[in-house]
Each structure stands twice: as C-alpha cells, then as structure tokens.
Amino acid sequence: EHMGSYEIGYREVERTGDDRVLAGLDNRFLAFTTHQDAVVETPPGATRIAGNDYGIQGFRKGRAWGVQFHPEYDLDTAERIAVKKRDHEMLTSAEIDAVLDGVTPENYDRACEAKRLFGNFIGVVEETRSAPAR
C-alpha cells in the first residue's frame, strides 16, 4: 500500500516473533529503510516477524522470508540512495538533509546488528541442505 511519503533513513524495527532468521537481534534494532510502500498485511499463511510504525518490516511463510528494511546497506550506499531521491525530486532537499544527518558511523554501527540475519539465514539453508530428503 502506498504510504503517501517515504520511510527513509535509519529507523527502529521491532521483532514481533521469535524467528530463527532474526535470532540474536535485540527486540528493537536499527536498520536502514527506503521505501514508499507499506506492507499492511502478510501473505496468507505467513507470520509477521518484524515491524514498526510504517508497517510490517518482515515476515515468514514456510521456508521463505521477506524483509522491508535493508541490512545490506553500508554508509556509502545509504548516502547515495538518499541523494538520488533528492536528485530525482522524490523528496525535498530539507527531507534529504534530515536523512543525511542520520547517516553516521554510530548509526551504521548500530544497524550492523541487523546483518546477523544473513548468517542466520545461511545457517537455516545449510541445515535444510544437510537434512535427509523427505
């Protein structure tokens, strides 16, 4: 669903379940977000695993996961994405300046916690690969 604005910048995300892919993350963690569409309901049969005031930030359905936030972004990527939105007049200079004020080494360091989901996901994949065929 279109939000009418952007969620962009380092934002708090809250775990809403006890999913293995988010294991080891604090109940509230920081992650970079950039989107203008909110996930307002999970697909049929899916479980919400993370969210914030902007909607669902993560869900799981069986052995498939989806997240709305961007744990893969480094400082350079976060800055380039924000500047690009200003260059394409998707957001005002004032809005982008506010985002760029938050693109700091401290926020990036805090957001690195979210990168744990990569290792957690690989662990699930390896476990699934080594399990006997059904």
Question: What would you call each of these model-derived segments?
Answer:
Residues Y73-R134:
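Acyltransferase
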